[in-house]
Amino acid sequence: MNRSCWKMLGSAALLAAGCGTETEEIPPAQLGTCMGQTASVIRGAITTDTTFTADKRYILSGRVDVTNKATLTIKPGTILCGDADQLMMNVSYLNIDLDAKLIADGTKDQPIVFTSSRPVGQRRPQDWGGIVLRGHAPINNPPDSGKGPETTCISAEANAGMYGPCGTIRPTDSSGVLRYVRIEFAGREFAPDKELNSLSLYAVGSGTTLDYIQVHRGSDDGIEFFGGTANLSHAVSSACQDDAFDWEFGWVGKGQFWVAMQDLNIGNNGFEADNNRMNAALEPHSNPMISNVTLLGLGQGVVPGGSDKRQGIALRSGVNAKLSNMIVSGFSDVGVFFEEATIAQALAGKVSLTQSLFWQNGKTGESRNISDVTLVGATSFDVRAWVMGQPGNLEADPMLVDPFNPTAPKLTLKPGSPALTGGTPPSDSFFQPVTHIGALGTDDWTAGWTSFPAN
């Protein structure tokens, strides 16, 4: 029996396909508790095709690697728990290697849930590490600038393994499918810039399906792109302790229908957008195309303890981006922030922010929907004048039904909302041709599969 693969639930359980076909008595030490039920403990490496099913519970204990070009398939309705009792440096997380795949294809009625092994009421951010996908798509973070881009192969944060072209550039690389998936109480920070996010996407290619994903109460960023070409639709990042959505290292994917809801006590930016913080000129430039997003901060005037960044959209380190149909509200620092390194990109027409609404950003008694600072780089740049000079941008109440309810938010638009019309869909086949502004119109695509537990 391949003991590095996994141990199944039961006193005489049949091993799943790919881990052998014989039966074996499982000693009690190999069982655990997941959401109050007995579960099989998964540890080490999954090296052959394996399937997890909804009639059982599973505990991820320590780093669980899917490797050797194996595919891990998780059936709709399956619940997996990250072992919260692991020590700091042996944090539990699911790590999908280069050339391996994760097929977690849930449904609206049967989402796949990754959560903490602690009982309901005792769960908290950082209980486990989250999910890491690593692919072969392009990145702009070479270890040696004298080598060609196809040779780039660098180590992911938290020693998760190598990622990048690693000998062959594959823009359409596939790491599998994540659809109708919830990831709760995950993330772990070992040191600054040495972190696990709830969902970390390292050089993930456009052949990967990422649709209907919620990350909730993670200790670091909700979803972060480290280069690559991955596309993401119908995403909710709620109550995460750092940024809701973060990208760097040359991410050039597409996104539509995203929601960010920051926690009322701690939480940073809605978007933290970078090209490369070490060298803003590196190519490929981060240049995503993103439409129909609702970014909700902490509520106007709320300043969380210890948080120094409360910006709706932070455009930094030479990033390019095409952003449209955004709602940005409730960020207690500013709605839109520009770093000086991004000025040249905006002046060259490589950054756009259009058909968007900004409302009640800034501290109580002030309005800072857009940064009022005039930056002086190679050329003076008035952030407010630039943003409000872009087509279709307004400072107006989007009239969301109940946006700042932490446990039962309602993000659809009220009758008469200025966001019901005026949206312009991007000219790209990836995007659904809706004309509302923000992530939701009058239909709530988050209903039925998302959840917002406090603990």
Residue ranges and their predicted role:
Residues 23-76, 81-101, 105-107, 111-220, ...:
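Extracellular beta-rich repeat passengers
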Residues 16-18:
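C-terminal motif of bacterial Sec signal peptides marking the signal peptidase cleavage site
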Residues 1-9:
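Bacterial N-terminal signal peptides that target proteins for export
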